[in-house]
Structure formats: C-alpha cells, structure tokens
Amino acid sequence: MQLYSIASGSSGNCIYLGEEDGGILIDAGISRKRIVTGLERKGLSLDDIKAIFITHEHSDHISGLGPVLRKNPIPVYATADTVSAIWEKTNMNNISPELFHSIRPEEEIEAGEMLVRPFSISHDAVDPVCYTVEKQGKRAAVATDMGCFDDTIIRVLGQCDSVLIEANHDINMLQVGPYPYSLKMRILGNKGHLSNTSC
C-alpha cells in the first residue's frame, strides 16, 4: 500500500493511500486542480478514488471537496458533526447529500479492498478523527492536526506498519515568531498541533 502526501500544511492537506490501480483520499483541502496534478504524478486520476475520508471541517482539509464532488461524485465519509459542519461552512450547491456518509470512531468502513477505521483525536474542531487503513494484512495511519496524544492513540499507532504523523512547529521559533499571541496559544494547546519535540 502506498501512502503519498499530495499536500500538507496550513495551506491545504490531501493524502492518497492505495495502489497503482486506485485507493482513497484523506482530506481534500486543496484545489481540485492540485489534487488532479498530484494524482497524475502517480499515474492516477480522480476516477481511481473509491472514497474521500475527512478528518475535520477546517478549510485546509475541505476547501477542494465541493469542486471535486461536482465533477466526480465520490463517496465522502466523516463523523456526523463534521458532515453537518461541512454543509454549513462550504458551498455544496449541486452536490447530492447522498454522497455523504456519517461514521463513528472505531467503526470499520470498507473502501474497495481497504478497511478504514477512524479514531478520535484532540483538536479544535467539532468531532475530529484520524484514520488507520488496512489492506492485505498491512496497516498504515494518517495522524494529523493532533494537539496531544494519549495511551489510546499510542496503542493505535503502535499497531501500524507505517505512520504519517504531523508535527508542524518548533516551540522556540513559534514563541518568538510573528504570529499573534492568541494563535500561538491555539497552536501550542492540547487542541492545537503537535510540536516537533512532542512528536
């Protein structure tokens, strides 16, 4: 199973998991054009995507979702509160609500030959999750936007063959950097983002 970061960071997030013949996306927080270009680099297209799994409703994780779904009616999976927040925050005109499927943490979802399982995380969103993906006895995890971790997350990640985990700041650089104090505290908090050191 390939794990390929099409984009990561505050400007947008989109991860591909699968094989040469298709797979899934985790998040669609960049333009449709950038997603298409990223997939083309791997010899893939949006027609090869079996499902899109959303971690949470922040714009850097969903901004490309509407444009993708208008041209490619791909099933979308997210927690019920996240689905509601997506519909409230983004332009979903001309998109069928039937594409959206509400899921619960620890629920197992089949996407082609892959088993996808969400797990709860701590972040400042309505009901954020990350995902493990299993295929042919191999398990990978995508763990982004976590403010902290606990024994459950350590156990989940410890059962994986590979893990893509986000750590997005050096504490000292953040503290002396140009961000407003409130943003610094948000990033450093338990519902923010892991630092390079804590990761």
Give a label for each model feature.
Residues A80-C130, E134-G137:
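Metallo-beta-lactamase
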Residues D48, A111, G158-Q159:
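Alpha-helix C-terminal capping/helix-to-coil transition sites in glycosyltransferase folds
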Residues V142-I154:
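Active-site glycine- and acidic-residue-rich loops that bind
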Residues D151-C199:
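Cap/insert and terminal regions of metallo-dependent hydrolase folds
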Residues M1-K42, V129-D145:
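Conserved beta-strand hairpin/beta-sheet module of binuclear metal-dependent hydrolase folds
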